[in-house]
Amino acid sequence: MEALVYVFLLVGTLMVIFFAIFFRDPPRIAK
C-alpha cells in the first residue's frame, strides 16, 4: 500500500508542475 501512496504523490507533483507551467506559458504545441 505504501507504493500506491508514493505513486499518488509523484503523479500529484507532476500534475502541479505541469499545470503551473501551462498557466504561466500558454501551450504552443499542436495549436
Curated annotation (Swiss-Prot):
PSII is composed of 1 copy each of membrane proteins PsbA, PsbB, PsbC, PsbD, PsbE, PsbF, PsbH, PsbI, PsbJ, PsbK, PsbL, PsbM, PsbT, PsbX, PsbY, PsbZ, Psb30/Ycf12, at least 3 peripheral proteins of the oxygen-evolving complex and a large number of cofactors. It forms dimeric complexes. It is found in: Plastid, Chloroplast thylakoid membrane. Its main location: plastid. This is Photosystem II reaction center protein T. The keyword Acyltransferase does not apply. Found at the monomer-monomer interface of the photosystem II (PS II) dimer, plays a role in assembly and dimerization of PSII. PSII is a light-driven water plastoquinone oxidoreductase, using light energy to abstract electrons from H(2)O, generating a proton gradient subsequently used for ATP formation. One of its GO terms (biological process) is photosynthesis. Belongs to the PsbT family. Keywords: Chloroplast, Membrane, Photosynthesis, Photosystem II, Plastid, Thylakoid, Transmembrane, Transmembrane helix. It comes from the Eukaryota. InterPro entries: PSII_PsbT, PSII_PsbT_sf. The keyword rRNA processing does not apply. It is a single-pass membrane protein. The chain crosses the membrane at residues 3-23. It comes from Gracilaria tenuistipitata var. liui (Red alga). GO terms for cellular component: chloroplast thylakoid membrane; photosystem II reaction center.
